[in-house]
Structures are given as structure tokens and as C-alpha cells.
From Swiss-Prot:
Keywords: Cell projection, Cilium, Lipoprotein, Myristate, Palmitate, Sensory transduction, Vision. Disruption phenotype: Deficient mice develop severe early-onset retinal degeneration associated with a disorganized outer segment, progressive thinning of the outer nuclear layer, microglia activation and non-responsive to light by 8 weeks of age. It comes from Mus musculus. InterPro entries: PCARE. Plays an essential role for normal photoreceptor cell maintenance and vision. Residues 101-168, 380-598, 802-821, 860-1107, 1127-1279 are annotated as: Disordered. GO terms for cellular component: cilium; cone photoreceptor outer segment; photoreceptor inner segment. Residues 1076-1090 have a biased composition (Low complexity). This is Photoreceptor cilium actin regulator.
Length: 1279
């Protein structure tokens, strides 16, 4: 290239930053002229940074010395300006960042050119620019360039001199002078930054102060209005009552005679008001006076500051103008010649080369464009400055505004820079919100116009940055960014008031103008050497330009690169680089905007937001329908199974906690629950059959769970979309039973209440679907809430027994979760119901059983319940089916216990067996009826407490059923259909059922035998009870169908768990907690004669039983007296009801003890649990069973007696508060049957309370009945 690398560097720096210096000096200088009044911010000084370049170096030095004070000011101003760019950056988000900072770095890097004479100005400008970031480099470069004292610079200068024919190294004084000038300018930059920072703070303060002042004015304006209102109202009052305030004077009446109390009071009050007004007036007046005086003094101070600042600005501008004129004075003549001589500086070589370099520099600046984009606010001013004075040109040539070379300080420059400064100040002040106040009025006007226009049009290019000529290189770059036309527009907009002065020069600053400006040089430089040098400089500049952006690249270019727009190669031609890069830069800005808009994170956030909003809408929209439908379907089922009455009460809190947990867990829990609800409502009902079929394995839970898994996603979306309180409320409403659902607690005694039906107690067929739904609910909790739920895994994978265990476990887990503490029990029961639903699966079978039994058993067991119940006991496996139907948690437990005994066919076998066994069992029941009756009395008391227990007893006839009933009992105990039973039952019955269910499997066989014999003995009297139980029987019909007879026959077993609690409650609890079989054995072993002993023993063991069979007790707690009566009648009536109603009491008791005592106890325990869970169904069954048992008067009388008492106790247990109240009705119903044994009724009722079905028949004796009532309270307490 002919130019040494140093030359290239110099040329590059000159071409890039040097041109910028030339341009910017003019821009700054014009601003500087205006600076005194309208350029409060020494942005002009920044521009004036270039001024030094124009003057000779020694002159620059002298100027530096002369302007030491002004230089300090300039430094402060420079700092302020630097701060101002920062402040403006804060104020102008678009990148008001002053090019002062970044551009200077570029300049320092770019401009190491050596300027001769007037070109020194360019050098100065460059140094001033780079001084901020690269002050050392800049100065050294300036020294090298101007003085070439550095070896490399000198070598390059010498080389360039030789190459350029007579290049002259800069004299030392010149270099030193320029060094001093640059030192001054650099320090001035930091000072300007400080000034800008202060101004920004002041503008911010003003922005805060103005609204406060406005508020102050408003306050006093309002106060004045109130005072005026008081005054006006007083005037109106005086006009109205002027003559009526005193007694009317009448002739002849002494004035003193009139009482003056009212007048005195009024006068006193008025005086107080006057004093108050004086105080208020003093306060307001003093405050207003102080405020006005303070504001006036502040205004005076501000005016003084303004005048002082203007004077300083004038001095500073004068010094800068002199500095510039001195630097440019020597170079006037040499300006034409020296460019060739001092090709090193790149100035002499530059007319065309510099012009092209200028464009190249613009390309480079475009490279900086992204950076400058930040500074665009200042860019406009800089651009205009560069356009107008673009060639540093000190454009004495092109800037003919005021003075060709002094022009930098001359008015044109002043106009340009001043608007820039004004804009800068305005940008700070406007963004500060008080800027106008901060800046002088004229400058405010100029600033406001340029700033507003610029700020609105090109806030990035606000004159602020321009005025911060400190960033000359950036301004050049930005100018390059902007097309000349844009620059002109910017300049015109920026300088509206004064800019128009600069406008003429700015059009000159257009590329054509610059070319014309450079043309003088270019003409002189047209010689071959000059042209060659120009080419070399272009190349070097292009390289240099490429190199320059790199240092700033980490800061500035990063943004550009991020913008995605690549700056065109700097080597581009002037026009090409100028137009293209600018557009590209803009496109880059657009790209940046697009990139932000298209930011995947933002898009994801927006998508999530929209999705959440949509989910919220869907959730709320579906919330109503879901709540309506799922409340009708799922809520009843969920409420009944998942949320026992206690659960219903707890449900709101648990639902909330679940909802919170689900929120933390991505709404997995709640959505699953919601899904469960929907599954209950629709998938569960729809999938009842599939779930039933799969209930053994708990596929029901899984199956429904899958459905819920589908719904849960939607639900989760909805919930996530609306994790708000409304959604929580919706969830609470969904999870918590509706009033109808809650009714089961109160309506448990009602047996056939729709609430019970919803709970699955009154209406067994719905219950099964509900339980199926519940099973899905459990599976749902397993799926989504299953985070810690064991049930979820066990349900899908476990076999029937395992499933029931998993149900039990899940019940515990759910209970532990407290989110579904009641539901877990019931939900577990519900899964058992799911198992019942599948008779094959025992739980599904149970649901099918109960469904089949529900119609069949209700029909058959109402007439044959007493008989069917023994058979139901015989089919304990179906009991699992019944429990699954009867209650969620019991079926689970039962499914575990009866897993092997569960048979899908058993559900229907239950129905058939209930009918057939009701018929067939009488003979076998003859033996067990004594036991059964003993238990029946005990159970009768229990069934009175928990008539549900009686239906369960009916369900117990078959071993499978008894198991099913055991879980069902557990379920019902869990299902807190009896309010206490549900509360206590769920907790107790679940453990009990769990513990007892394995043993109950054994009991199932024994209990089935007992139930078979018991239905025989219990069946006759049970018809009446079934009639009574029939009301509860519908819900329990599956259980009740087979249990009716069994319940009544088995009622002792069922009640046995219930009434045995007192006598055999230890066994019951042992059975459930320790060894149900032992309880069963003890129950069978106990004879009616033992009844008293057992009752005593049960009293002793009630403590144990209360612990083990708290659920049973809670289930059967209702009527102690009724239990005694029911038990005695049951023990007596079961033998009578059964083949030998009269004398079988002890015989069945013995038989019961021997064969089915344990089973009956287990069954009765199971049923007790189930009854506790679902007392109402039993109550209804008890009524229907009574009616059916009434077919056999003796048996009916006794069994009805027992079951009436049991119903009384059951209903009382269900109603807990009305055990005795219901007893009288039961006593009345029993009175016809057991008129002679009304006393027995009282004891059977107590026996029902104590009878857990686990105690020996003897415990069912009247003697037992007495302790049983006590044990019942214990159980209640325990539960």
C-alpha cells in the first residue's frame, strides 16, 4: 500500500475518527456558541474538544493554559456530559448513551492520526473523543501522529514523509501543546459526565418535585374551597335564621325572663368554632407563607445559578473557540499543502481519500451503528455537527457559518451544538421531568423543540449525544448510520430554534457538502501521489476501520451482532457504505426488536400466559358445569366415598391444601382429583363396568385413573390456569360434598336420603358407580396426587388382596396426606367399591354384587334379608364386593382380606346366596342363631346405632360377602355416613378392617356359617327389621340384600362387631387390631348365657375394643340402651326368628360361637365398620329388613326388635345425637314385635352400640348390652 502499517493505522484513525473530529468539532463548536445560554450542558465543550485541533499545537497549549479554569469547567462539564450520556441512557432507553463513552473508545482506537496545523483540530477531536476511554492511547497516538516523537510514529511519519515527498514531523512544541489540549479536553469530558449526572439527578428531582408541588397547590386549593364553602354556608344560614336565633321580643315582656340556654350553647359553640378557625387559618397561612417564600428563594437561587451558568458557558465557549481558532489559524494556508506533506496524519492525503475515508468511517461507524444506536440521541446532533462541520473540516471551507476555521466556535457550530446540548440537557431534563426548570428558558425552548422533535422522531439521535461531541467518533458513525438527508433532518429537528442556523451548514454536512468541502483538498491532492495516497489511505482506513470496531466490539458490536445485522465491510465505497450500513443498522434495530419479540423465552412466557388464561377460562367455564355434573355424580360419589361426612367437613380445607399442593406440584394433585371427579361423574360411571371388571387388580382405579389422567390434564390446565381463590373455591366445592352430599352425615339415619345416595349409602347402585368413580379418584390421586400416594401404585398393580391392601395403605396414606384424610378412607373404600364393582375382582364384584344385590337383594333381601344375610355371610368374598359398594375404605381393606375370596360372581352370588342362603341358612342358622341372636342383640344395638351395620350383616352371609361387608363396614365406618362413625369409623374401621380383613377372611367362612345360621334365627324377626332397614337398605341393598337376614340374622355379627365392642369389643379390636379371629372365636365361644359375662368382659375389653374398634364404636356408638334392647331381643329373637326363634338364642349362640361366631363377629365387625362408614344404608336396610323379617313374626319381632333397636342405635349412631330419639321409634316398631321384650330392646340397642361383631354371642346378651353402651361411648371417644 505504500503506507506503513503505522501509516495505515494513522490513516485509518484519521479517516475514521479524524473525519469524525472534523465533523464533530464543527458540530460541537456551533453548539458551543449557543452553549452559554442554551447549552448549559457543555456538550459544546465536548464538541469543542475538537476545537483544539484547528489551532496550532502551541496555540492549543496556550489555550489550554489560558483556559485552565475553563478547562476545569470543561472537564467537569465533560464528566457531566459523560454522565449525561449515562443519564440520558437512563432517560432515553433507546441508547441515549452518549457516544461520548463508546465512540471515544473507538476514536481513540481509530484516531491516532497525526494532524498538522488546522488538521490538528481533527487530531484533538479524536483525542478528545478517545480521551474518554483511550486517553493514554489517544494522547500517545496524537503525539505520535502530530509529533511523530514515538519511534513507530516517527518511523511511520518518516516513511510516509518520504513516501509523500516532504512530509514533516510535528514539532515538539506543537505536539506538547496538543497533548496539553487533549489532557484538558479529556479531563473536561469526565467533568461533563459529572455535570450530566448532576443534571440528570436534578431533573429527576424536579420530576418528583413538580407533582409534589402540584399536589401542594391542590391541597391548598381544596382547603380554600372548603373554607369558601364554610363561609358561603354561613352566609346562607344567617340569611335563613337571622331573626330566629333569639327569643322574639314582645311588648311588655321583660327580655330577662326568657331562658337563654339555647343561645348560650350556640354562642359557646360558635366561639369554639371561631377559635378553631383561627388556629386553622394560622396553620394554613403560615405554611403557605413559608412555602411561597421558600419557593421564591429557591427560584431566586435557581435564577442566580442560571445566570452564573450562562456566564460560565460563555467563557467556556469563548476559550474553546479561541483554542479551536488557535489550532486552526496556523493550518489555514498549510491546510491545503500540509495535507499532502503530513500524509501520516491522513489529513493532507484526505481530500478525496478522507472523504471516502469519511464514508468508510461511516461504514465503520455503522459497524458501531449498533453502539451508536444507543447514542443516537446524541447521534443526531453529532451527525448534524458532522454534516455541518462534518469534515472536522473545521470547515472554514465548508462551514462558512461564522468563520471558516473558527467556525467550530462560530455561530453555525454553536447553533448545531447548542441545540445538541440543549437537546442533551433537554433529554436529561425532559426524561428527568424537570429538565426545563433545570435548563435555562431559552435553552429549554431550544432543547424542548429539538429534543421533543428528536426525542419523538429519533430519540436515539437526540442532540444530547450530539452535543456530547465527546463521542465524536460515534457521532461520525451514527452520522454514517444516518443518511445525510437523515442527518439534515435530524439537525433540523434537533436544532429547531438554533438548528436552523446550523441547518444551512448541515445540508453542507450532507455527503455532497462534504465532498465539496473536501474538494479543495481533493483538488490540491489530485496529484498522482495524492491519489495514490488516497487509495492507500482508503485501504488502510478500511483495515483500520475493521480493526477499530473490535476493541469496542465486546461492548458495542455485541449489541449489533445481537441485533443480527452485520456491519458492511468498512472498505465499502463512501456512498455504498453510508447508505447500506445505515439501512442495515436500522434493519439491525428492527432485527433486534424482532429478536426480542421472537425471543423464545418471551414467546414461551406469552404462550404460558395465554395458556394459563385459557385454562382459567376453561376451568371457570367448566367449573360450573363440572360442579353441576360432578356434584350430581362425582361429588356425591366423591363426597360419599372420598369425603365422608367428616371428610366433607374437612374437604374444604383438605381441598385447599390439595389445591395448594397441586399448585406446587403443577396442579397434578388437584387436576387429578378434578379428573377423578369427572371420572366419577362420567368416566367412573361409564367405566364402572370396566372398573368393576378390573377392580380386583384395581384396574378400576387405574382405568378410571387413566380417564382421570386425561381429564386431569385438562383439569390441571384449568387449575393451573386458575390457581386462584376462585379455582380453590371450585375445587373445594368439587371436593367437598354439596349440601346434599353433606346431608349424608345428618341423613345417615335417614338411610334413603339423596345425600346418602350420593354418598352411595342409600342408593347402592349409584353408590357403585360413585365408588367406581371413587376408585378412579383414588387412582387419580395415585396418578397425580400419587406423588406420595401408595394407593396409586398398589391399585394399578396389586391383585385383589394386594389391591385391598393397597387401598388400606392408600387409605392410610391418604389419611396421612390429610389432603384426602377422610377421602382416603372412603376413597380407599371406594376402591374397594371398585373391587366390589368387579364381582370377579371381589371389589368390582362387590359393586356388581351391590348393584345386583341392590335390586335383587333389596327385593329378595327385604323379604329374605334375614335369610339372605346368612348366605351373604357364607359368601364372605362377595362381602368384598358389598364393601366396595358400601364404602371405599372398607372395600379396600376387604379387598385385601377377601382378595382371595373376592369373586366377581360372588356379587351376584351374594344376591342369589342372600336369597338362597336366606332360605338355606335357617337350618345352619339354627345353631348360629343363638349366637347370632346374641350378636344380633348386640348387633341390633349396633344396628340401631348403625342400621347400616345390619345391612352389612345381611351382606355378611357369604364369606366373600362378609369380607366384602367387612370392608364395606369399614368403608361405612369410614364413610362417616354416621357422623361419628364416619369420623371415627374411617380412621378406626380402616385400621380395623385392614387388620381384621385378613382374619375376616377366616371369619368369612365362620362368619358366613354364623351368618347363615344367624339369618335362619335372625331371618324370621328380621323381616320387620328389614322393613325398618329397608329404608337404609337401598344404599346397602347389596349388603342389605344378603345381610338383611344375615344382618338381622347376622345383625348380631354385624352388631356383633357393634355390640360385641362392649362384650367382645376387645376381640373386635383384637380382630381388627390384633386378631379378628380371636374376637370371632371369643364371640362364638361366648354363649347367650355368657352374654352377661361377655358383656362384663366386653366392658373390660371395651377399652381394648374401643381402641381396636373405634370405628365400630363410632359406627355403633349411637344408642347404648337401644343396643341393650336390640341385643337382648336379637339374641332372643334370632333363635326365634331363625328355625328355633324361641330357644335358639343360646343354641345359635353356641353354634354361632362354634361355627360362625368368629365369622359373624368378623362379618359383624366388617359390617360394623361398613355400617359406621355407611350407617344410613344399614338403617334403610334395617327398615326394609324389618319389613321383610316381619314376615316371620317371632323372628321378625325379635329381629325387628333387635334391628329396630339396632336401627335406633344405627340411626342414632348415624345421627349420634339422636340415638335415643330414634330408639323410641324403633322401640315402637319393635314394640309390636317385642312388646314383651321391650326391655330387651333397650339392651339390644346397647349391645348394638357395644356389639362389634367380633365379640361372642354372650356379649350380645342383655348383660353385654349394658357394658356395650359403655363400650360404645368408649368407642365413640376413641373414634
Amino acid at each position: 500500500m505504500g503506507c506503513t502499517p503505522s501509516h495505515n493505522v494513522i490513516v485509518n484513525s484519521v479517516a475514521k475518527s479524524g473525519i469524525q473530529f472534523f465533523k464533530k468539532p464543527k458540530a460541537i463548536l456551533p453548539g458551543c456558541q449557543w452553549g452559554s445560554p442554551k447549552c448549559p450542558i457543555p456538550l459544546l465543550v465536548q464538541s469543542s474538544t475538537f476545537c483544539d485541533s484547528g489551532g496550532e499545537l502551541h496555540l492549543g497549549e496556550r489555550l489550554v493554559e489560558e483556559t485552565v479554569s475553563s478547562s476545569k469547567k470543561l472537564q467537569a462539564m465533560a464528566e457531566g456530559v459523560r454522565q449525561l450520556p449515562k443519564a440520558m441512557e437512563g432517560l432515553i432507553p433507546e441508547s441515549q448513551t452518549f457516544q461520548v463513552n463508546k465512540p471515544q473508545g473507538h476514536r481513540a482506537t481509530d484516531i491516532s492520526f497525526r494532524t498538522e496545523g488546522s488538521h490538528g483540530t481533527q487530531e484533538v477531536d479524536f483525542s478528545g473523543k478517545e480521551s474518554k476511554e483511550n486517553t493514554p492511547q489517544e494522547t500517545s497516538k496524537g503525539n505520535r501522529e502530530s509529533v511523530c516523537h514515538q519511534p513507530d510514529s516517527q518511523d511511520h511519519c518518516r516513511q510516509s514523509a518520504t513516501e509523500s515527498k516532504g512530509r514533516v514531523d510535528f514539532p515538539e512544541p506543537l505536539v506538547k501543546a496538543h497533548q496539553h489540549a487533549y489532557a484538558y479536553l479529556h479531563t473536561s469530558l469526565s467533568r461533563y459526565e459529572a455535570i450530566v449526572r448532576l443534571v440528570q439527578q436534578a431533573s429527576q428531582t424536579w420530576g418528583l418535585l413538580r407533582p409534589m408541588l402540584n399536589f401542594l397547590l391542590l391541597c391548598f386549593e381544596e382547603a380554600g374551597q372548603l373554607l369558601s364553602e364554610i363561609s358561603k354556608d354561613g352566609d346562607v344560614l344567617l340569611q335563613e335564621v337571622r331573626g330566629d336565633l333569639a327569643w322574639p321580643l314582645r311588648k311588655g315582656e321583660p327580655w330577662e325572663q326568657h331562658p337563654d340556654l339555647l343561645q348560650q350553647l350556640l354562642q359557646y359553640t360558635v366561639s369554639k368554632l371561631r377559635a378553631l378557625h383561627g388556629t386553622v387559618a394560622a396553620l394554613t397561612g403560615s405554611f403557605l407563607e413559608g412555602s411561597s417564600s421558600c419557593l421564591r428563594s429557591t427560584a431566586g437561587h435557581l435564577e442566580g445559578k442560571l445566570s452564573t451558568k450562562r456566564g460560565i458557558d460563555e467563557c467556556l465557549l469563548r476559550a474553546l473557540g479561541q483554542l479551536e481558532s488557535l489550532t486552526s489559524s496556523h493550518g489555514d494556508a498549510g491546510l491545503l499543502g500540509p495535507p499532502l506533506c503530513s500524509e501520516d496524519s491522513g489529513i493532507g492525503a484526505d481530500n478525496e481519500s478522507v472523504h471516502s475515508v469519511e464514508k468508510l468511517g461511516k461504514q465503520a461507524s455503522w459497524d458501531f451503528a449498533a453502539e451508536l444506536g444507543e447514542w443516537k440521541p446524541g447521534t443526531a446532533a453529532q451527525v448534524e455537527a458532522r454534516p455541518s462541520g462534518h469534515a472536522w473540516q473545521e470547515g472554514p471551507y465548508w462551514t462558512g457559518s461564522d468563520r471558516p476555521q473558527d467556525c467550530p466556535l462560530s455561530s453555525p457550530r454553536i447553533a448545531k451544538v447548542q441545540p445538541a446540548v440543549q437537546d442533551e440537557a433537554r433529554s436529561a431534563s425532559t426524561s428527568g421531568a424537570g429538565a426545563e426548570a433545570v435548563t435555562s428558558g431559552p435553552s429549554e425552548a431550544a432543547e424542548s423543540l429539538p429534543w421533543d422533535s428528536l426525542g419523538a422522531e429519533i430519540p436515539v439521535r437526540t442532540p444530547l449525544s450530539r452535543s456530547s461531541g465527546l463521542t465524536d467518533a460515534p457521532s461520525l458513525s451514527e452520522e454514517e448510520d444516518c443518511s445525510p438527508e437523515e442527518e439534515d433532518e435530524l439537525s433540523s429537528t434537533d436544532l429547531h430554534p438554533e438548528p436552523q442556523k446550523a441547518l444551512p451548514s448541515r445540508p453542507r454536512s450532507s455527503p455532497d457538502t462534504r465532498e465539496s468541502l473536501f474538494q479543495p483538498y481533493s483538488k490540491e491532492l489530485r496529484n498522482p501521489q495524492a491519489q495514490e495516497m488516497i487509495l492507500k489511505m482508503k485501504e488502510a482506513i478500511s483495515e483500520r476501520i475493521k480493526f477499530v470496531p473490535e476493541p469496542s466490539r465486546p461492548q458495542d458490536w455485541t449489541e449489533e451482532e445481537e441485533g443480527g445485522t452485520v456491519v458492511p465491510p468498512r472498505p465499502r465505497s463512501v456512498s455504498g457504505s453510508r447508505g447500506g450500513p445505515e439501512r442495515q443498522r436500522r434493519s439491525q434495530s428492527e432485527g433486534c426488536l424482532k429478536s426480542h419479540v421472537e425471543d423464545p423465552t418471551l414467546q414461551e412466557l406469552r404462550r404460558v400466559q395465554t395458556d394459563l388464561s385459557r385454562r382459567l377460562e376453561v376451568f371457570y367455564a367448566l367449573g360450573a358445569t363440572r360442579q353441576g355434573q360432578s356434584r350430581e355424580r362425582c361429588l356425591p360419589s366423591r363426597a360419599s366415598v372420598l369425603w365422608p361426612p367428616t371428610n366433607c367437613r374437612v374437604s374444604p380445607s383438605s381441598a385447599i391444601s390439595k389445591f395448594k399442593a397441586s399448585l406446587t406440584q403443577n396442579f397434578s394433585i388437584l387436576p387429578n382429583q378434578d379428573k377423578s371427579i369427572f371420572q366419577k361423574g362420567s368416566p367412573c360411571f361409564d367405566g364402572e363396568q370396566p372398573c368393576q371388571g378390573k377392580a380386583e387388580k384395581l384396574p378400576n382405579a387405574i382405568f378410571c385413573g387413566k380417564k382421570s389422567g386425561r381429564a386431569p390434564r385438562d383439569n390441571e390446565r384449568d387449575i393451573r390456569a386458575c390457581p386462584t381463590r376462585p379455582s380453590v373455591k371450585t375445587l373445594i366445592e368439587t371436593f367437598s360434598p354439596t349440601e346434599s352430599l353433606r346431608m349424608p352425615r345428618n341423613c345417615r339415619n335417614l338411610g334413603s336420603s339423596p345425600c346418602l345416595r350420593k354418598w352411595g349409602v342409600p342408593a347402592m347402585p349409584p353408590r357403585f358407580p360413585i365408588y367406581r368413580g371413587l376408585a378412579p379418584l383414588y387412582s387419580k390421586p395415585q396418578i397425580s396426587p400419587a406423588a406420595g400416594w401408595r394407593p396409586s401404585a398398589p391399585f394399578p398393580s396389586l391383585p385383589l388382596a394386594e389391591v385391598s391392601e393397597s387401598e388400606d395403605i392408600s387409605g392410610d396414606v391418604e389419611e396421612d396426606l390429610e389432603n384426602l384424610p377422610p377421602p382416603p378412607l372412603e376413597v380407599l373404600m371406594d376402591k374397594s367399591f371398585a373391587a366390589l364393582e368387579c364381582p370377579e375382582c371381589s371389589q368390582p364384584a362387590g359393586s356388581s354384587l351391590e348393584e345386583t344385590l341392590l335390586p335383587g337383594l333389596q327385593e329378595a333381601s327385604h323379604p329374605k334379608r334375614t335369610w339372605v344375610s346368612p348366605r351373604l355371610k357364607a359368601s364372605m368374598s362377595p362381602m368384598d364386593l358389598l364393601p366396595s359398594k358400601g364404602s371405599g375404605s372398607s372395600p379396600r381393606l376387604h379387598s385385601t382380606r377377601s382378595g382371595s375370596t373376592r369373586i366377581v360372581g360372588d356379587s351376584r352370588k351374594l344376591t342369589l346366596d342372600l336369597n338362597s342362603k336366606q332360605t338355606a341358612s335357617p337350618s345352619s342358622e339354627a345353631k348360629s342363631r343363638a349366637q347370632i341372636q346374641a350378636r344380633a342383640e348386640t348387633i341390633a344395638g349396633f344396628s340401631k346405632q348403625h342400621q347400616k351395620a345390619i345391612p352389612w350383616h345381611h351382606t355378611n352371609p357369604t364369606p366373600g360377602q362378609s369380607r366384602t361387608l367387612e370392608p364395606s363396614l369399614a368403608r361405612f365406618s369410614r364413610d362417616p355416613h354416621s357422623s361419628e362413625a364416619s369420623r371415627k369409623g374411617p380412621e378406626r374401621s380402616l385400621p380395623r378392617v385392614r387388620k381384621a380383613s385378613p382374619q375376616r377372611a377366616q371369619w368369612a367362612s365362620q362368619g358366613d356359617r354364623r351368618l347363615q345360621s344367624l339369618p335362619s334365627s335372625h331371618g324370621p324377626s328380621q323381616p320387620g327389621l328389614p322393613a325398618v332397614l329397608s329404608s337404609p337398605s337401598p344404599p346397602l341393598s347389596p349388603r342389605t340384600l344378603s345381610p338383611p337376614a344375615t344382618r338381622k340374622t347376622t345383625s348380631p355379627p354385624c352388631q356383633h362387631p357393634q355390640s360385641n365392642p362392649a362384650p367382645g369389643s376387645p376381640p373386635v379390636r383384637r380382630t381388627e387390631t390384633n386378631t379378628p379371629s380371636s374376637a370371632s372365636c371369643s364371640s362364638p365361644s361366648v354363649s347367650p348365657s355368657r352374654g352377661s359375662k361377655d358383656s362384663i368382659h366386653s366392658e373390660d375389653s371395651e377399652a381394648t375394643t374401643a381402641k381396636a374398634s373405634r370405628n365400630t364404636c363410632s359406627i355403633f356408638y349411637p344408642a347404648a340402651t337401644s343396643l341393650f334392647e336390640a341385643k337382648s331381643s336379637s339374641s332372643t329373637s334370632h333363635p326365634q326368628m331363625l328355625p328355633e326363634p324361641g330357644g335358639l338364642l343360646r343354641t345359635p349362640t353356641g353354634g354361632w360361637r362354634g361355627s360362625s361366631g368368629q365369622r359373624l363377629r368378623a362379618d359383624s365387625q366388617k359390617r360394623t365398620v361398613l355400617n359406621a362408614l355407611n350407617p344410613l344404608p344399614f338403617v334403610r336396610r334395617t327398615a326394609s329388613d324389618r319389613q321383610r323379617q316381619q314376615g316371620d313374626q317371632l323372628q321378625q319381632s325379635r329381629s325387628d326388635w333387635e334391628f329396630h333397636s339396632c336401627q335406633n342405635s344405627s340411626s342414632s349412631s348415624s345421627s349420634e345425637e339422636n340415638p335415643k330419639q330414634e330408639l323410641p321409634p324403633w322401640n315402637n316398631s319393635r314394640v309390636p314385635e317385642l312388646q314383651g321384650s321391650s326391655t330387651k330392646r333397650a339392651s339390644p340397642l346397647e349391645l348394638c352400640v357395644l356389639g362389634h361383631g367380633l365379640q361372642p354371642e354372650a356379649r350380645m346378651n342383655r348383660g353385654q348390652d349394658r357394658p356395650q353402651p359403655e363400650s360404645q361411648p368408649q368407642h365413640k371417644e376413641i373414634s
